[in-house]
Amino acid sequence: MLRGARSHLSASVALAAVLAAALLSSFARCSLPGRGDPVASVLSPYFGTKTRYEDVNPWLLGDPVAPRRDPELLAGTCTPVQLVALIRHGTRYPTTKQIRKLRQLQGLLQTRESVDGGSRVAAALDQWPLWYDDWMDGQLVEKGRQDMRQLALRLAALFPDLFCRENYGRLRLITSSKHRCVDSSAAFLQGLWQHYHPGLPPPDVSDMECDPPRVNDKLMRFFDHCEKFLTEVERNATALYHVEAFKTGPEMQTVLKKVAATLQVPVNNLNADLIQVAFFTCSFDLAIQGVHSPWCDVFDVDDAKVLEYLNDLKQYWKRSYGYAINSRSSCNLFQDIFLHLDKAVEQKQRSQPVSSSVILQFGHAETLLPLLSLMGYFKDKEPLTAYNFEEQVHREFRSGHIVPYASNLIFVLYHCEDAQTPQEKFQIQMLLNEKVLPLAHSQKTVALYEDLKNHYQDILQSCQTSKECNLPKVNITSDEL
């Protein structure tokens, strides 16, 4: 009976997915502006963590599978011997929480009184169906699978020695348990299959020559396993004070009034959360289907900058420099990366083949941001607060430019045969979103491997996740009892 119920549920979900895809396809065929629409393009830089990868790397709009070799990449007598990549999942559906807020907003529109000669945007939204459903809940979309397949093709072309056919069986893949990450890892493998076997359909991941992706949430979702983070940040009602304060601040109030006028609803019926989900709906429609939604017409660039800052405040205080535990909770992941690199160095020194030339780890924006913060990247002189929006217009910390969908942080270890000293034989570069990332401490584009380890010595040797994440014990004296 239970099996039959499950089969019926699966069939219903599958049918809903097909209908949703067909509905979206019909939207795209209607006389709607496409990806090159000017309004969508001017808002795109401000979508925060809901940003398309190609908006960070515009050259991909021309040819999404052609690699772009950064001129700063090492070449000549230095040969890449290992690549360790931390990859965010591809484009996804909104979460159930976001979908329910959108339904609430649509309900407000349906109950408003129509006004003759009223807002063109409000009229367009009246005709725009709400196609999101609860079952979608953050799952990877087909565009997200495409993100991963194309990234695989580009990396394989950029580092042919590492992604050679002989190394395929020795690939190591780690993933978060979330479906969007598991599915992203599978799509990446399909892209590699396409690289090795052009024109042939890929088999199931379980039938490929390499080992299937292995779930490891202690690495990819370290924040869920850090009691200090969970208590002091995740479950702490005051931890995101600056986020909540900005929601009621003058910048957001200006946006609220403008949006209320555009939608023809009382301003008291709106709040910052509803406004933000409307803005994200513009980004979802663009990212998932490449269509220009009427939700995009609700906002202008000034509104977008305010809403981007609201999103960045949350990322800053919950995942980055706002609290030390945000980044210190990622020490285990950072150390794991260097364990792989150390092993490769040791094997090369012994004239042995590198056992794992490519290690791929699939996680979340919440995986990447703390790690980059731990390494000292994108840190502004002044913290982001609810009260310095104007001063932070040119800030370094813009989450959409750092961790869009499919974002990736790559460590490339090189063996330099003609090095003058033993220390120079092993050098390292980092790439963020396929562009060489200058070292945070020196701004150089390449480092001796030992020098980089020395710079991060405290993290590699002294940062123990068990100690970092333990809550301080509260001593209760007999007087207090």
Swiss-Prot record:
InterPro entries: His_Pase_clade-2, His_PPase_superfam, Histidine_acid_Pase_euk. PROSITE patterns: ER_TARGET. The gene is Minpp1. Pfam families: His_Phos_2. It catalyses: 1D-myo-inositol hexakisphosphate + H2O = 1D-myo-inositol 1,2,4,5,6-pentakisphosphate + phosphate; 1D-myo-inositol 1,2,4,5,6-pentakisphosphate + H2O = 1D-myo-inositol 1,2,5,6-tetrakisphosphate + phosphate; 1D-myo-inositol 1,2,5,6-tetrakisphosphate + H2O = 1D-myo-inositol 1,2,6-trisphosphate + phosphate; 1D-myo-inositol 1,2,6-trisphosphate + H2O = 1D-myo-inositol 1,2-bisphosphate + phosphate. GO terms for cellular component: endoplasmic reticulum lumen; extracellular space; plasma membrane. Glycans are attached at N236, N475. The active site is at H89. This is Multiple inositol polyphosphate phosphatase 1. The lineage of its organism: Eukaryota, Metazoa, Chordata, Craniata, Vertebrata. GO terms for biological process: intracellular monoatomic cation homeostasis; phosphatidylinositol-mediated signaling.
